[in-house]
Amino acid sequence: GVDSHPPALPWPHFQWFQGLDWRSVRRGKEVYEQVFAPCHSLSFIKYRHFEAFMSKEEVKNMAASFEVDDDPDEKGEARKRPGKRFDTVVQPYKNEQEARYANNGALPPDLSVITNARHGGVDYIYALLTGYGRPVPGGVQLSTTQWYNPYFHGGIIGMPPPLTDDMIEYEDGTPASVPQMAKDVTCFLEWCSNPWWDERKLLGYKTIATLAVIAVSSGYYNRFLSGLWRSRRLAFRPFNYSK
């Protein structure tokens, strides 16, 4: 077959006592904005969600740089306004028909929950982004608008290789190699799919710790304190009324 299973990688947030790599998440946002945003939407993400790794002022300025649909004016005519924190991230296309027309009939998937929606999750996304350029197996026929990628189902994908070395410049100066950009945008998409990952993980540890304390306390009480009550016996002594 032409399909390959993505290799499992040591993502930090899968470790016991580590969370999301927030520097990587922020860099991944840069990759998304400059490479993937023109085609792929984030329909479940609002600008205020970016405050998880950006300042409120940065988020306000980012939202205001886009125009969104506003309520119609007194004449009923449509109008625009600068975006605000509570607005959904601006979508690249107005509707599905426009998206398909711009992509040779294919509908670019929304990336809001892509790591949850694809088998293999982050491993699949990273493998897909770095899987171009492999030798095409015999029997696989490609048109001029198709590419071979062993990690895509069927091996034939309509999306051209999205990443090339040094195609962007990171704000923090990190070298923008293909593996680096693939790793960063994958971390960003993992955050989009699971924005409360760290909070849920911390809550899980707190729950485990609380249950452990309750279990130890209950065991101690049962072993050393409740024995006093369990060893007591009630005896019925009838009252002697003759005295």
Curated annotation (Swiss-Prot):
Membrane-traversing stretches: 202-221
MF annotations from Gene Ontology: heme binding; metal ion binding; ubiquinol-cytochrome-c reductase activity
InterPro entries in UniProt: Cyt_c-like_dom_sf, Cyt_c1, Cyt_c1_TM_anchor_C
Membrane topology of the entry: Single-pass membrane protein
Regions of this protein lying in the Mitochondrial intermembrane compartment: 1-201
Its EC number(s): 7.1.1.8
Entry annotated with the keyword Mitochondrion: yes
Cofactor binding comment, as recorded: Binds 1 heme group covalently per subunit.
Chain coiled-coil ranges: none
A GO CC term assigned to this protein in UniProt: mitochondrial inner membrane
UniProt keyword list: Electron transport, Heme, Iron, Membrane, Metal-binding, Mitochondrion, Mitochondrion inner membrane, Respiratory chain, Translocase, Transmembrane, Transmembrane helix, Transport
GO biological process: mitochondrial electron transport, ubiquinol to cytochrome c
Family annotation (Gene3D superfamilies): Cytochrome c-like domain (1.10.760.10), Cytochrome c1, transmembrane anchor, C-terminal (1.20.5.100)
Amino-acid positions noted as binding heme in the UniProt annotation, renumbered to this chain: 39-40, 159
Reactions listed under catalytic activity: a quinol + 2 Fe(III)-[cytochrome c](out) = a quinone + 2 Fe(II)-[cytochrome c](out) + 2 H(+)(out)
Domain Cytochrome c span(s) in chain numbering: 5-194
Quaternary structure and interacting proteins, as annotated: Component of the ubiquinol-cytochrome c oxidoreductase (cytochrome b-c1 complex, complex III, CIII), a multisubunit enzyme composed of 3 respiratory subunits cytochrome b, cytochrome c1 and Rieske protein, 2 core protein subunits, and additional low-molecular weight protein subunits. The complex exists as an obligatory dimer and forms supercomplexes (SCs) in the inner mitochondrial membrane with cytochrome c oxidase (complex IV, CIV).
Further comment: This cytochrome c1 is unusual, its alpha-band exists at 561 nm instead at 553 nm.
Function: Component of the ubiquinol-cytochrome c oxidoreductase, a multisubunit transmembrane complex that is part of the mitochondrial electron transport chain which drives oxidative phosphorylation.
Family: Belongs to the cytochrome c family.
The protein's name: Cytochrome c1, heme protein
